[in-house]
Amino acid sequence: MKTWLFVDGYNIIGAWPELTQLRDQSLEEARRKVIDYLSEYAAATGYETVLVFDGWRVKGNRGSSLENPYIEILFTPEGVTADMAIERLVAGLPKHQKIYVATSDRLEQETVLAQGGLRISAMELHNMVFTQKEAQRARIARQPQSANPLDAQLDEAVRRKLHAMIHEENE
């Protein structure tokens, strides 16, 4: 069973303190940062993640998507809010999927619950993302460090050939 995470991008940017502060300087940078955070989270959890940004007030906007290896990023067309897009996407999923929707919009939360999804507030998602980030840092810190990190990843036969080549050049 797949686990899905749908995220209202601007709602998250408006709720997370570090993103709100960044948004006040550059909305583009705040979007990039939320994409980075959610990409890392999706890579670590395996959740099918869809990040939706409102484009509903942009005249003539047809909507678009961005390429990302870990998450799907959608910009809604004119007249379609992120909430509306998320509702449609959730309604179109096959039954028996685990679905989380991250938004602090009360009406959206109720709609998601009615469709069988689970709601996550913006701050709950914040805690989940940063708890995962910290757990990953701790795992990396516990791993033994090699003087040559590439050397530790090489197959023994390849390592011997490389060492032989290095010694031939030095002679």
Residue ranges of predicted features:
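Nuclease catalytic cores that cleave nucleic-acid phosphodiester bonds
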Residues: 3-7, 11-171
